[in-house]
A protein has these predicted regions:
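Bacterial Sec-dependent N-terminal signal peptides
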Residues: 1-22
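Beta-propeller folds
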Residues: 18-229
């Protein structure tokens, strides 16, 4: 009886330990020094080789980025809340430097907690447009290269589900922007809403060497969501 009681107490103790809430923790200082390094910035230059744009990224994706909502449609992986690819690795800071000058100039006016992507120089290379992703959507911003200042142009209503949501026009002053229509139907969450039809797959045809594709449209709900993009 004593041996059986001891075993029972041990098992009970193990169960209690296993159910403890464990939070995210930092590794030791030695490991952190090796893993948590600062990435070198990526560089983009104008064709006249007068200015360069330095783009800085986090070494790793944040927990918020890894935990974001993801919808898989027709080979795309998007965030249905922000309407941009869920696989984007964002830029968090921008600096400008004259090629003939060693000093880097911090771009002023950038959004707080910047999540920047879709960087594009204007045709005359005097301005740089980019998008910033908020918790609700995607905004359009523009930088004046000579003064290294950024300014927001739109609210967070851009449609970046199918690539860059804007294009520069030849006049260097106009941007053609894709925005979400106000009457766009809401995307259907397969995990919450009743699907519009069953999942259907076919096995007709003969064997072939064709490649396979991920995240194909599987039912009427997927089709409706893809049309809404």
């Amino acid at each position: 009886k004593l041996k059986l009681l001891s075993l029972f107490v041990f098992v009970g103790t193990f169960s209690t330990i296993a159910q403890e809430n464990v939070t995210y923790q930092k590794p030791s200082a030695e490991i952190l020094a090796l893993a948590d390094y600062e990435r070198a910035p990526s560089v983009s230059m104008d064709t006249k080789k007068e200015y360069m744009l330095l783009s800085y990224r986090n070494t790793y994706k944040t927990l918020d980025d890894l935990n974001q909502t993801e919808m898989k449609l027709g080979g795309l992986r998007i965030n249905p809340v922000t309407n941009i690819s869920s696989t984007v690795t964002y830029i968090n800071n921008l600096k400008i430097r004259k090629i003939k000058d060693k000093n880097e100039i911090q771009v002023s006016g950038l959004p707080a907690n910047a999540r920047i992507t879709n960087i594009s120089w204007s045709p005359n290379e005097k301005k740089i447009a980019f998008t910033n992703t908020t918790n609700q959507g995607v905004e359009l911003w523009v930088i004046d290269v000579a003064t290294a200042t950024a300014k927001k142009l739109t609210s967070d209503n851009l449609n970046a589900n199918l690539g860059s949501p804007f294009n520069w026009m030849k006049d260097n002053e106009t941007l053609l922007v894709k925005v979400l229509p106000k009457n766009r139907p809401a995307l259907i969450d397969n995990n919450k809403d009743l699907p519009k039809g069953p999942t259907v797959s076919t096995s007709d045809g003969s064997k072939s060497q064709n490649r396979t594709y991920q995240d194909l449209l599987k039912n009427k709900t997927d089709e409706a969501n893809f049309d809404a993009l």
